Each structure stands twice: as C-alpha cells, then as structure tokens.
C-alpha cells in the first residue's frame, strides 16, 4: 500500500526540484522566482524500493486570503491535510526565517508525520541552517541537496518504517470483497450468521457527501458524540479517519473523509481533491452512504462517487438530509426517486432514505437500510434455484440470434459474493448484446430480491474453463465417476 508525501515550505526552497528528482521527470516548473508553482502537482515517486505519491505544493506565504497567493496557501494547507507525511523544506543557506517558524507551527497541528528537511545544505554553506533548524521543534533535520541528490538515503531510512506502518494499517482497514463461493458449496444456502457484524469484524461504512450536506452532523448523531474527532482512530491515510462505535446493537466502523469536511470552493483543483478523498474512503467500506442535501440533490460530485462505489462493488444507500426543512414531502420524495432511477440506473432499487441529521429523525430507517444492503451484498443463491430461474427467463424472452445463430444459455452458477457474481455458460458469449445482459441482471434483482447491490454477470463459452477454474475438486465429478477415474 503506497502513501502520500507532500513537499511543503516557503517559495523557492527547492520543493519542485526535489519533486522532479523523486518522480524522475521534470513535471514541475523550476525557477528562481518565488511562487512559480501555483497549483498542486502529483506524481508517482520512487525512492530505492519505496513507491508512493508525492505532491508538489505552492509555497506557504503569509498573505491575505483574498489574493492569488492566499488561494495558493489554502491549497497547500489542503494538501497537508490530505497527505500521510509532510516533508517541510527550509533553505539551508538562508536559515530559519519568521515565516518558517509560523508554518512549522501550522504543520505540527495539521499532520501527524512531519519530516524536517534542510535543502541546499551541501558543503559548509548549509551548516548554519542545519543547526538553526533544530529550533523549529520538529525533531532532527535531514540535510538534503535536491539539485545534487544528496541526503536521499537519509530520507529513505525515515520513510521506510512509516511506509511499513501504513501497509499494516491498510491490511487491517481493507474489507473482504470478491469472496469466492467454493464449488462444493454452490448448492448450499448461505449461513446468515457468517457475515453478521461483530466487534472484531464490524460493519464498515463510509459516509460520503459534500461539505454542506450535513455529513459530520450525521456521523456525530450516529456515534453519540459531540465532535467527530473525539477519540478518532487513524485509518490508512490522514484523510480517512475511522471511528468505532455501536449503532442499535450493531458494531460499526464509520470512515469519514477530512477532505470533504471543509468547503472546497477555492478552485477546481480543490474540488477534484475533495472528490479524490471520497473515492479513497469508498475502498475502505462495505456499505457506502451517499448523503445528499435535499435542496441540491444529485450534483455531479454525488453522482461520481455513487457510480464509483458501484464500480468498486460496494453496497450503496442514498440518504437525503435536512428532510425536516422540506415542506412538500410527498412531492419531493417522488421527484427524488425519479431522479435517482434516471441518473443512476446501475443502482436501480437501491434504498433512498430521508433523514434529519440535526434531529435524528429517520436514523432508524437508515440503520435498517444499511443492514439490508449489507445482507444483500453477501447474498448467495443455490445453483438449482438459479438454473430454474434462468430457464424461465429464456422461455419468456429467448436470447437473440446474431447472424442466424441462436445463443444458447446452458448453465448458471454463483461464483462470488461481496458483491454477488454469477457466470452463465453459453454459446457465442462475445456476441451476447448488452441489452440481454441487462435483462438478466434486472431479472436477478427482481426475482431474488437484490435491489441496488452491484451484480457481476459473466458470459463464458463452451471452450472456456468451468466457473470454478483453478480450484481443486474435493469430490469426483459425475463424468469421472462414470469413467471410473479419480481426481
């Protein structure tokens, strides 16, 4: 699991030069004029055997928020909140300036991992700056020369244990998804207790929403605390913070995104970063709650995240907040359902719940909808039931006959859960039109009561390996029994 490193500091301390060295390309403009970098630049960095994302930021400057430099500074502060690690650079030839002291204090408050680097420290010219750097209270500084590549080994040895810690937490945070259904269990009903949330394995929920949707208020109401950040448990990244709690007897772990807590209207780049934070939180979740503001529902950002959750195979629940402020409730509800079906057809039937995070009304319904979505996400259907259903579907609406050759659907089985995944053995799978696939997926939703959850349907030909490919058989097949052979 990679991590994110933000390079921050005053203008013209060598941030872009170091960025270019780490990514191995000249992606950032380098100039002696302060403030050349006016935006955030991301790149894939390599440092010996470490792989991580590096962000080159605009220079931190003490300026008014109304100026271009003010917007650059806010963008940099945003990057600091996003990053897992911050490398704070000062100029070893200039030494510590009052601005360095101010921003060292900001970094201590905003990021858990801050590395102090003294750049341009090659030779005796950087000795004074390296000694002065101790006064910033950020621990032992490392001497660097981004221009000549000096100090990269020291940076590696500091980043290595941090990277290992993030990798361990990533493994602990990641939910179990795309679970194989063993062949010998394909004809067995699933045990409903097998996926029931426990204290050891709580139900993992990501609440995603725009800053004014009331996300923090909703989470605070669910966990019963006044502040979201009261005793938070750090997740894999600074922007993914998880809180463990119990909700109506259900052990839960709610992932919140720091990046979407604050207004991100500074620039288009900030808006993109906020969306990126939300997308990262989706990967930690089993169920994603997309929180909408009843006054401005289904904006582009909401649709992108809901679509991404479906693509990632997560269960989705849509919650419409501030319902207590709505006057024409019945008309509004009908309008919301129509918009949902039209804008997100791939999530047809997903629960849409109205809530008031402020008063707590509707949270019982939200809890029930989340549990039901989680249950459907874990649903298993026996092969016998699937093939009975498939026969009825084919009889009601036979597959097309491209080029005069009728596509024959011979056999169907479920091969995965979390989300449900099915394989249909058929002739000419490459010629199966998308419209017929949608017909089967919608039929699965309706007949087996699986609204809203992502459904994966794969067509395989007679020459393909069987649906349980690359798995060892525990019992002899009927054909091998007939031939008198053993597996």
UniProtKB/Swiss-Prot annotation:
Residues 451-487 are annotated as: Disordered. Residues 471-487 have a biased composition (Basic residues). GTP 1 binds at residues 9-16, 56-60, 119-122. Residues 3-167, 203-378 form the EngA-type G domain. One of its GO terms (molecular function) is GTP binding. Residues 379-463 form the KH-like domain. Keywords: GTP-binding, Nucleotide-binding, Repeat, Ribosome biogenesis. InterPro entries: G_ENGA, GTP-bd, GTPase_Der, KH_dom-like, KH_dom-like_a/b, P-loop_NTPase, Small_GTP-bd. CDD domains: EngA1, EngA2. GO terms for biological process: ribosome biogenesis. GTP 2 binds at residues 209-216, 256-260, 321-324. Coiled coil: none annotated. Associates with the 50S ribosomal subunit. HAMAP family: GTPase_Der (MF_00195). GTPase that plays an essential role in the late steps of ribosome biogenesis. Belongs to the TRAFAC class TrmE-Era-EngA-EngB-Septin-like GTPase superfamily. EngA (Der) GTPase family. This is GTPase Der.
């Amino acid at each position: 699991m990679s991590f994110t490193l933000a390079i921050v500091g005053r203008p013209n301390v060598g941030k872009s030069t170091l960025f270019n060295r780490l990514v191995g390309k000249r992606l950032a403009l380098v100039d002696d004029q302060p403030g050349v970098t006016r935006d955030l630049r991301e790149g894939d960095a390599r440092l010996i055997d470490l792989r991580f994302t590096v962000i080159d930021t605009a220079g931190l400057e003490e300026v008014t928020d109304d100026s271009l430099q003010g917007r650059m500074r806010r963008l940099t502060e945003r990057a600091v909140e996003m990053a897992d690690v911050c490398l704070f650079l000062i100029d070893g030839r200039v030494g510590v300036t009052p601005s360095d002291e101010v921003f060292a204090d900001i970094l201590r408050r905003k990021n858990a991992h801050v590395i102090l680097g003294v750049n341009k420290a090659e030779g005796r010219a950087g000795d004074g700056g390296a000694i002065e750097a101790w006064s910033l209270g950020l621990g032992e500084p490392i001497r660097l020369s981004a221009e000549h590549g000096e100090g990269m080994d020291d940076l590696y040895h500091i980043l290595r244990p941090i990277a290992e810690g993030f990798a361990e937490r990533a493994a602990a945070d990641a939910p179990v998804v795309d679970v194989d259904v063993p062949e010998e269990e394909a004809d067995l009903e699933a045990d409903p207790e097998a996926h029931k949330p426990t204290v050891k394995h709580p139900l993992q929920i990501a609440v995603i929403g725009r800053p004014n949707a009331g996300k923090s208020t909703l989470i605070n109401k669910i966990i019963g605390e006044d502040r979201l950040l009261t005793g938070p448990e750090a997740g894999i990244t600074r922007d993914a913070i998880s809180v463990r709690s119990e909700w109506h007897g259900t052990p839960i772990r709610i992932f919140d995104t720091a990046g979407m807590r604050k207004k991100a209207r500074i620039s288009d780049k900030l808006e993109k970063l906020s969306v990126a934070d939300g997308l990262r939180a989706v990967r930690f979740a089993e169920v994603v709650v997309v929180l909408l503001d009843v006054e401005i529902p289904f904006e582009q950002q909401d649709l992108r995240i809901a679509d991404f959750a479906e693509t990632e195979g997560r269960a989705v629940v849509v919650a419409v907040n501030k319902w207590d402020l709505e006057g024409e409730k019945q008309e509004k509800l009908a309008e919301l359902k129509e918009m949902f079906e039209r804008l997100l057809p791939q999530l047809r039937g997903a629960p849409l719940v109205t809530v008031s995070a402020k008063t707590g009304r509707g949270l019982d319904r939200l809890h029930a909808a989340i549990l039901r979505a989680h249950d459907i996400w874990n649903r298993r259907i026996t092969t016998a039931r699937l093939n009975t259903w498939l026969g009825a579907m084919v009889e009601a609406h036979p597959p097309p006959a491209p080029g005069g050759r009728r596509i024959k659907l011979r056999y169907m089985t479920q091969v995965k859960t979390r989300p449900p995944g099915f394989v249909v053995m058929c002739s000419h799978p490459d010629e199966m039109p998308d419209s017929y696939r949608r017909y089967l997926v919608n039929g699965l939703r309706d007949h087996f009561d699986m609204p809203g959850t992502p459904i994966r349907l794969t067509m395989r030909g007679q020459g393909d390996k069987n649906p349980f490919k690359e798995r060892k058989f525990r019992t002899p097949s009927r054909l091998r029994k007939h031939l008198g052979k053993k597996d």
